[in-house]
């Protein structure tokens, strides 16, 4: 049976005797079986939950937080629907900001309100309307599901509020539930948990389709916020692979994430977020490149060190990265990357490098740490620097916690409803044939390649097998990596070779072929997704909106949701929203700041593009959860029959 993480639960539960006896312990008589059967069949009639899929966040923690908190614009639309004509714009904006940012909004308003009566008036203005919203978003859940989502300390109260209208509770009853919170200073925590519950009920599942970090300010902030969401699933991207590899001590991955952090001026995520000091790199840079202007090493983002030092730091870690990549390539001939082992191809006398059998002049010829008799060997200063960083990365508790979370919640692909979700591509040749790649000694392609890689990643976090650690680096930049999908990553060329021919990176044919409907159907069949209604969803390759590109491909069965979330690459971003009645893309725009949202009511109001519509609207029965419900129902029906026949226990009643 497929792993549950993929949402591809297949087949019915066998009605064998051992299972029936186990079920009989939980449902000891006919009445309990009939009750559960009724509840399961009723659950199958509920509308399917709303799923949001985002991708390529790249460290933009504050923007992601806003998109999660405003449910990709959905909460604003729902409030407009519920409160149209009932409240003025000022109260509407106040309500929104307290749902998006309850703590921050309270701290701002607390100083303005002063005395307790004014704070009580604010609570009395907000809570009844938030409870009305809570009742609305709770409709799609049965009581057992609600109990799993409601915060434990507040669950009895929130349950009372949800059911109060059905029980015709008096205004005095409702006011009494608030009294102690106002009298004892518990208003903020109440508002905070109520807002989070509303958001968690509005979006039943958040899927992040890869690339949590790099380029943007704080990968640690992105993961921290995602970890607070009630129900999260992840498909890994190539940037996630490099961070997981670095956490586990793979040296080329360590150098890669260090170089990216320095290049984009994202030092705070290392120093403050993960407690990884950069002093070893500063010392290496000053010792080996102290008089080097490092003109080839531009940086982006805030200058948290002086400009010359940042350039030297970037060059020092880049050379170290290329050496460590060379060693990784030589350890793994099965990767087929001998042509990317570029340091031995440098001619230091002539200042040229041979790439793909062609010689190119180099823009930089100062390499004091390279021994041209053994170019991939680390110098003593580089060894010291690397040893310190390896220790720092492997001993960071926060990094281990966050990368373990990515590993545990992550997969190479997911299926939700009729959507096949993965980060990058399925590696194919020009004719659309699946390309094989060797994983842990076995040559695999297509869906089997995804499964083999997924198993290897989980193995890496259990055993730290060196072969698997090197595979994590290959996932970052290997041509047959499903999360990379290009012939090369031209980092070396971008630094040292001005010729655009050498810098060119060619995408896997997959990215063109997804415009072809028959190719998409082949992919959907490979992953056992409905070929008629199936939709392939991937990120990784930014949609060039400004150049007229569309996220929806010509096939109508593939969509790319990398909208250039990062400011560095366009400051857009998409959420794919899977609702009961439709699937649509919400395109996001620039987000100023949390402070601006609170003080001026600014919001990201997305542009919506409908991808699919469903009539009638889909229910739980139409989803993967519906498959699971049918399997549970079949098992319970078998137990009921066994009770009636007297073959299991003795029916009561």
Q: Where are the predicted features?
A:
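Feature recognizes metal-dependent phosphohydrolase scaffolds
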Residues: 1-653
